[in-house]
């Protein structure tokens, strides 16, 4: 846990999933402090919109203003709810919207934590363009190293005149005034042909490797299991290309597409609808934190390309949680398949959790591993 003192309230905040006690990662950053400082002497009129509030620092601080928390991360929503409870703040004080929803009209203040991907930022700025006014105070913040010329140009192009502040504690802010500059419409998704198939893959803004097949997925697809039955999970499904391939290779199986990103799940659904519509009755689509709340001993197989970062921080906490959830939800003799960068050494992590691990394939960058849930159902 970490403490954030600001002009609105003193907060105790924690990350979600929780990090280990040896190397704890902080649940807020200097950009959060810097953003809140700008509102110290501001009379807030109209709705408050907060975008990409990773662990709820801004939402908790501004809870008395009934803010809208907007983003593309279910884990961030869970983190915000947990930190509201931790600080004795009514959860209903914050209203949660995903980035594909319509934003509230005529906001008084918009606070933006600049996301990792420029595509997501553009989608969010275009959505804001439909609701902000010249009187809306628009402030974005991030580590100074993460604000580039392209970031500022995007604000200018979509919303209007943009300036940046001096760095403070290695953070920098962007101030923007809306003046409705001319803007060409942009498609909601980016599409490309999947090599070796007649499929067209459609990606929403925040999907990993948006403009083509990432090399890890390409390697994984060469080693996917075939002729499975029962339920299979594409965990952390992204655009669903792994699950789509599983549907094709395992015609007797049902595939459950799971991701914490609403845009990823929407992309997966769209890709099944447009490429294998006849398989929709063998699909389930789930926005979730890994397999939280899913009953144990349910699945025959889980396939996963786990992330090794959360927002801008490098961490294996999300991967660890995925592995533990997979073990709990697999049937006896059910199998977990993962692809990962070789340097992450997930072989020993899986062996610790499952008691076994087998290398299926490897190249100079990636490894495909399999672990089996052994033992008896109790």
Swiss-Prot record:
The record's Gene Ontology cellular component field reads: cytoplasm
Q: Which InterPro entries match?
A: DNA_methylase_N6_adenine_CS, rRNA_m2G-MeTrfase_RlmG, RsmC/RlmG, SAM-dependent_MTases_sf, Small_mtfrase_dom
Task: Tell me the GO molecular function terms.
Answer: 23S rRNA (guanine(1835)-N(2))-methyltransferase activity; nucleic acid binding
Per the record, what are the reactions this protein catalyses? guanosine(1835) in 23S rRNA + S-adenosyl-L-methionine = N(2)-methylguanosine(1835) in 23S rRNA + S-adenosyl-L-homocysteine + H(+)
The entry sums up its family as follows:
Belongs to the methyltransferase superfamily. RlmG family.
* Annotated compartments: Cytoplasm
The molecule here is called Ribosomal RNA large subunit methyltransferase G
Give the record's keywords alphabetically: Cytoplasm, Methyltransferase, rRNA processing, S-adenosyl-L-methionine, Transferase
Q: What class of enzyme is it?
A: transferase
Provide the function of this protein: Specifically methylates the guanine in position 1835 (m2G1835) of 23S rRNA.
Keyword check for Methyltransferase: yes
Instruction: Tell me the classification of the organism that encodes this protein.
Output: Bacteria, Pseudomonadati, Pseudomonadota, Gammaproteobacteria, Enterobacterales
Q: Which Pfam families match?
A: MTS
Q: Extract the CDD domains matched here.
A: AdoMet_MTases (cd02440)
Q: Please state the Enzyme Commission number of this protein.
A: 2.1.1.174
Q: HAMAP family from the entry?
A: 23SrRNA_methyltr_G
Keyword Mitochondrion appears in the UniProt entry: no
């Amino acid at each position: 846990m970490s403490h954030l003192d600001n002009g609105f309230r003193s907060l105790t905040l924690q990350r979600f999933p929780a990090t280990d006690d040896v190397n704890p990662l902080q649940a807020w950053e200097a950009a959060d402090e810097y953003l809140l400082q700008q509102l110290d002497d501001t009379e807030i009129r109209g709705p408050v919109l907060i975008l990409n509030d990773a662990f709820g620092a801004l939402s908790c601080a501004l809870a008395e203003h009934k803010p809208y928390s907007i983003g593309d991360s279910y884990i961030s929503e869970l983190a915000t709810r947990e930190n509201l409870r931790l600080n004795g703040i009514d959860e209903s004080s914050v209203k949660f919207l995903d980035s594909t929803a319509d934003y509230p009209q005529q906001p008084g203040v918009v606070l933006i934590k600049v996301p990792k991907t420029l595509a997501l930022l553009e989608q969010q700025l275009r959505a804001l363009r439909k609701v902000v006014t010249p009187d809306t105070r628009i402030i974005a913040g991030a580590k100074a190293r993460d604000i580039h010329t392209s970031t500022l140009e995007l604000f200018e192009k979509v919303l209007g005149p943009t300036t940046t502040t001096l760095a403070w504690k290695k953070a920098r802010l962007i101030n923007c005034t809306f003046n409705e500059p001319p803007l060409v419409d942009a498609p909601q998704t980016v599409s490309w042909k999947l090599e070796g198939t007649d499929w067209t893959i459609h990606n929403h803004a925040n999907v990993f490797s948006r403009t083509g097949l990432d090399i890890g997925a390409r390697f994984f697809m060469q080693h996917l299991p075939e002729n499975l039955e029962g339920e299979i999970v594409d965990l952390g499904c992204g655009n669903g290309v792994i699950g789509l391939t599983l549907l094709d290779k395992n015609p007797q199986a049902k595939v459950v597409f799971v991701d914490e990103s609403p845009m990823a799940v929407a992309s997966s659904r769209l890709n099944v609808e447009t490429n294998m519509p006849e398989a929709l009755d063998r699909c389930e689509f789930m926005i979730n934190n890994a397999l939280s709340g899913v009953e144990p001993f349910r699945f025959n197989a889980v396939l996963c390309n786990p992330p090794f970062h959360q927002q801008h921080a490098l961490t294996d906490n999300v991967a660890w949680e995925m592995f533990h959830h997979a073990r709990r939800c697999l049937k006896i003799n059910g199998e977990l398949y993962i692809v990962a960068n070789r340097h992450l050494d997930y072989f020993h992590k899986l062996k610790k959790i499952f008691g076994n691990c087998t290398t299926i394939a490897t190249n100079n960058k990636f490894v495909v591993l399999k672990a089996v849930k052994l033992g008896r159902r109790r």
